[in-house]
């Protein structure tokens, strides 16, 4: 993750802390399907993705200028799900109304670990009103991951947050980068987090670019920890470990998505951290994924 993204999440934390939501709003949320499906459908020509989403960090510059217009553009492309990373100085009620007008749902959102640690009730109120099923932490400070002890303390915190989320009929998840695959004290941090967290309380959003960059095979983790990856970030890698639009790189998407049921994948979010043209990027990725058969 770049320093820009860390700053973006820090700003999001400040925005979340400034919001105060009445508890009564929690019952008004529109929720995505909770059936635990794979997000894919079968056909005579093979399986294909049914619900394709996008991580809104990809379009942050456009959303800051024209929030509703950008969401409307995503709906016109064909997206039906979005994943938030910041609320752009809007109230959850305002955002929910816009989503409903555009026919979009927000099954997940990224929230800073600090917000969930320091104000779990307020943060989970926001997630509930937005209609999330999953509340995701997308970054760990170095102090939370630089030793075996700190990793286990982080896992304990994840379990506590997961319990608080479960009490609200939400699920807590953690999103990886590549640092989780560099050994710390002889251990792989991602493995420690998976082993030390309760499978009934903590899930994972596998970023398929970053795990590839980290030198690991997603299928290995699907086999070792089945059902723990309900969310994936879909972004491609080209020569030189460059991030590119989905379909423009070398990642074998059919191979990965063929194991979606073992992984437990429910939601697929397209992302590109630094696209030259955000709308062109998410359009190209969407078209590739709509045509993919596996």
Predicted regions located by residue number:
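Active-site acidic/histidine proton-transfer and metal-coordination neighborhood
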Residues: 81, 88, 113-204, 211, ...
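Gly/Pro-rich active-site loop or hairpin
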Residues: 71, 181-183, 187, 210-265, ...
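N-terminal secretory signal peptides and thylakoid transit peptides that target proteins
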Residues: 1-23, 27
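C-terminal segment of N-terminal export signals and the immediately downstream linker at the start
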Residues: 25-62, 73
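Conserved, mostly hydrophobic/aromatic
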Residues: 54, 74, 82, 99, ...
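Hydrophobic faces of well-ordered beta-strands that scaffold small-molecule active sites
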Residues: 50-55, 82-84, 106-109, 135-137, ...
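Active-site mouth loops of central-metabolism enzymes
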Residues: 55-65, 110-116, 148
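Acidic (Asp/Glu)-rich catalytic clusters
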Residues: 42-48, 72-76, 90-106, 119-132, ...
């Amino acid at each position: 993750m770049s320093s820009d993204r860390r700053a973006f999440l820090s700003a999001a934390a400040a925005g979340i802390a400034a919001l105060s939501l009445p508890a009564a709003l929690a019952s008004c949320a529109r929720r995505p399907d909770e059936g635990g499906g794979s997000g894919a459908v079968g056909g005579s020509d093979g399986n294909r993705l049914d619900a394709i989403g996008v991580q809104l960090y990809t379009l942050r510059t456009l959303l800051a200028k024209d929030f509703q217009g950008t969401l409307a553009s995503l709906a016109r492309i064909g997206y039906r799900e979005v994943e938030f990373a910041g609320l752009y100085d809007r109230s959850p009620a305002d955002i929910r109304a816009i989503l409903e007008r555009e026919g979009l749902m927000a099954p997940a959102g990224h929230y800073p670990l600090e917000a969930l640690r320091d104000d779990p009730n307020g943060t989970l109120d926001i997630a509930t009103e937005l209609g999330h099923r999953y509340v995701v932490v997308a970054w760990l400070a170095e102090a939370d991951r630089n030793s075996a002890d700190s990793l286990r303390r982080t896992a304990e915190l994840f379990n506590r947050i997961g319990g608080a989320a479960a009490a609200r009929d939400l699920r807590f998840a953690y999103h990886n980068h590549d640092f989780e695959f560099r050994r710390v004290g002889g251990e792989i941090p991602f493995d420690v987090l998976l082993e030390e967290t309760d499978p009934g309380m903590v899930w994972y959003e596998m970023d398929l670019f970053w795990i590839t960059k980290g030198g690991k095979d997603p299928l290995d983790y699907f086999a070792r920890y089945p059902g723990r990856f309900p969310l994936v970030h879909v972004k491609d890698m080209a020569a030189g470990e460059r991030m590119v639009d989905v379909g423009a790189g070398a990642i074998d998407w059919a191979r990965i998505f063929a194991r979606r049921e073992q992984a437990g994948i429910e939601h697929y979010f397209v992302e590109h951290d630094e696209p030259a043209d955000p709308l062109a990027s998410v359009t190209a990725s969407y078209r590739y994924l709509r045509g993919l058969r596996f």
